[in-house]
Amino acid sequence: MVTTKMTAAFRNPNRRQVATDKVAEKLSSTLSWVKNTVSHTVSQMASQVASPSASLHTTSSSTTLSTPTQSPSSPSKLSPDDLELLAKLEEQNRLIETDSKSLRSVNGSRRNSGSSLVSSSSASSNLSHLEEDSWILWGRIVNEWDDVRKKKEKQVKELVRKGIPHHFRAIVWQLLCNAQSMTIKDQYSELLKMTSPCEKLIRRDIARTYPEHNFFKEKDSLGQEVLFNVMKAYSLVDRELVTVRAVLSSLDCCCMQMPEEEAFCVFVKLMQDYRLRELFKPSMAELGLCMYQFECMIQEYLPELFVHFQSQSFHTSMYASSWFLTIFLTTFPLPIATRIFDIFMSEGLEIVFRVGLALLQMNQAELMQLDMEGMLQHFQKVIPHQFDGGPEKLIQSAYQVKYNSKKMKKLEKEYTTIKTKEMEEQGEIKRLRTENRLLKQRIETLEKHKCSSTYNEDFVLQLEKELVQARLSEAESQCALKEMQDKVLDIEKKNNSFPDENNIARLQEELIAVKLREAEAIMGLKELRQQVRTLEEHWQRHLARTSGRWKDPPKKNAVNELQDELMSIRLREAETQAEIREMKQRMMEMETQNQINSNQLRRAEQEVNSLQEKVCSLSVKNKGLLAQLSEAKRRQAEIECKNKEEVMAVRLREADSIAAVAELQQHIAELEIQKEEGKLQGQLNRSDSNQYIRELKDQIAELTHELRCLKGQRDFSSRPPFDGIHIVSHLIGDDELFHSSDEDFIDSSLQESAIGFPLHRKSGPMSLNPALADGSESEAEDGMLGPQESDPEAPQKQPPQRESYSTTV
């Protein structure tokens, strides 16, 4: 059991050698003896720790649990060998703990039960009495956790507020959050074998978490690997939660206190039962609620600071969001942060509200004198180091803050109501935006329809103008097309006059081939010259030998003959080599000619292909031009039909205008005739009008006298009474009873003088105008003016034929 405890302290292969070197000498003398006796000793100590002789109780002055009167490690109950063994073990533990590079050894030691920790701590003779009693007390609490949690929960909370011993923190955290009996612990190894989609994101954030801590500092270290495994397993359990650095801060604290399986279980409990999962969701609705509650607390307890924050636009989320997300793990140093985390494991997020408000109370005077940037610097640099001496002052101030859970629930309801209203308003705004967009689209469509309906005459006129412009542009384009075609023909003629490019290429190839043959011939000539030189040398030597042949012996003569034959063979060889070279030369010429022909053939094929492509393109263009021509003909036919219709319409309009002009001319002629008649009548009226009026008055007076005379002779009972003189119109051939010479005279005088009285012709009797009869001479003169001055319409109303007038009395 001790060997497993020791080996757990050296999991990190990078630190294993250092720690081993430090403790190897001290452990070598006791290791064999420890293996034989440690199991018996530990069981004896555990039974002594769990004995009912020392019970938990509270005092009236303090709520802490009392310590027993006698330590279970008392020398009176342990043998000297046991005491020596325990002292040596504790000494080795202290050496391992003091080594900064073997931090993992503490975590390994926490894998054991609380009873073994109590036994190892109680045996230390160097610890103070108070620390020893604290260890024993926490050992009893751990062993009797179920009963203590049910019966004395307040005392446990008070002990947690005073601080959990370092060696008990792992087991106490598990007990506080009920993580020991989780079934998910058995699934941890299976989860590590699976692949998570968030692995890259986890790797990226791990390197940025606690970069100054030795346990997580080095890349791919044991700490980073443990952190990656736990976070990967949780990402497979809770796929909705997106991993963030704040999540890793809480997980780091767990991984530094306990093995990774237990850290995984504690982390799952934190996310499920301590509202951390709601804080880390993408929507962060729980964080908004915490910010609202904390801001209301500031407004209630620190109103001046709240007003200062509002005036500087210093929002609560700018400094307090990290407090709730990391439980002050990234704000304070690790010892202070773990003390706050102990209370968080016991009491939840309440400690965050208390500590945050206590910090603001203690720094209110400094914050009131700073602007927004200064306050940010103060929160980032000053506040984290205010409690380096110890967290007792901070925790004491935090529990002096008034925290009302009922009011916090009320604020939660208010926040929920506000958010619900905001969501409803947002939904209403979205609905209105959608309706507005639909209405805009409908307005646009209506405007389009309206514009299309308002084309009518303007649109037709515009189309006519565009048609005229299109005809003009078509004529211009046809002229330009003819000019371009002429230019193309000229360019083709000039191009045909130039030498063919194929001939140039062929000549260049032939030139290259000739140069190659010339170079080969020169090389062959040089070789032949060299051979001729060698043959000449051989020939000279042969002549020198044959000149003295008759003096030589027969053997030497035979040798000379053989040499002659050899020379003749060499000569024939040279001749054959010359012939071979000639054949090679001819062969090379043939190959060169073949290559030239193949190049010419390839170029001819390329030309044929290019010509075929041109033919295809020209055929396509021809089809397009034919289609354009047919379209142009169709348009021309339509235009001609329209022109004919327009011509017919113009002719009809011309005929109508001619008829209207003829009518107007006839009307003008009639008006001119009436004008002439009026002029003549006016001339007649102006001549001797005054004298005629006097004569007419005299005649009227005579006629009235005659009428009066006739009244006594005849009865005019059948006639209507006369108010004056009535002039009755009679057509020619009418019969009247009474005609006298005076009436005939008046009638004839009226016809001859054409008096200017306005005689209104009616179907009944016509009367003279009384204004002319009773008026003065000046008024008569004014009334008898010409028809153009008095009544311009009078000449038009007078009939062109004269009628006879007679007066009946």
From Swiss-Prot:
Region annotation Interaction with alpha-tubulin, gamma-tubulin, BIRC5 and FBXO5: where it falls in the sequence: 1-483
Ranges for region Disordered: 49-80, 99-123, 760-809
Stretches for region Interaction with AURKB and INCENP: 487-809
Segments of this protein annotated with the region Targeting to the centrosomes: 377-809
Tissue specificity remark: Widely expressed.
Main subcellular location: nucleus
The keyword NADP is annotated on this UniProt entry: no
Gene Ontology CC: centrosome; cytoplasm; nucleus; spindle
Low complexity: bias regions: 51-78, 103-123
Entry's Gene Ontology BP terms: cell division
Region (Dimerization): 128-693
Entry-annotated residues carrying Phosphoserine: S102, S113, S497, S689, S776, S778
Ranges of residues in domain Rab-GAP TBC: 163-348
Membrane-spanning parts: none
Entry's localization field: Nucleus; Cytoplasm, Cytoskeleton, Microtubule organizing center, Centrosome; Cytoplasm, Cytoskeleton, Spindle
UniProt-listed SUPFAM superfamilies: Ypt/Rab-GAP domain of gyp1p
Maturation and modification: Probably phosphorylated by PLK1; may be required for degradation during mitosis. Ubiquitinated. Degradation during prophase is ubiquitin-dependent.
Organism superkingdom: Eukaryota
Coiled coil start-end: 406-717
Annotated function: Functions as a regulator of cell cycle progression by stabilizing the FBXO5 protein and promoting cyclin-A accumulation during interphase. May play a role in cytokinesis.
Protein name per its UniProtKB record: Ecotropic viral integration site 5 protein
